[in-house]
C-alpha cells in the first residue's frame, strides 16, 4: 500500500511504501546564509521524519543540492553536527540551479519508517 501525506496538486511531502518514507526536497529561508538555510532544511526534515514515523537514525539516503559547490564546507559543518554519530546515510551532494535564485541548498531524504 502507498500512503501519501500533505498532498497538493504538484507533490506529496511524504510518500510511504513498504516501510520506506520518501520526503520531498526541503529548502531553507531565502536570503539566509548557507549554514542558516541548511539548518532550516534539516529542521523541516526532522518534522517530516517524525510525521512519517521515522527519525534521523533511520535515514537511508540523502541527496543534497547546492547552488554553488564553494558552499560545501559550510553546509557540511551543519550536516555533520545534525547527523547522529554512527547513523550517516548513503549520501550524494552536487551542484544544481535551484528553483529560485536566492536558494542555496536543497536536501532530499529517504528513511526507513514504522
Each predicted region: which residue ranges?
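N-terminal presequence-like segments and the immediate start of the first folded domain
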Residues: 1-60, 66-114
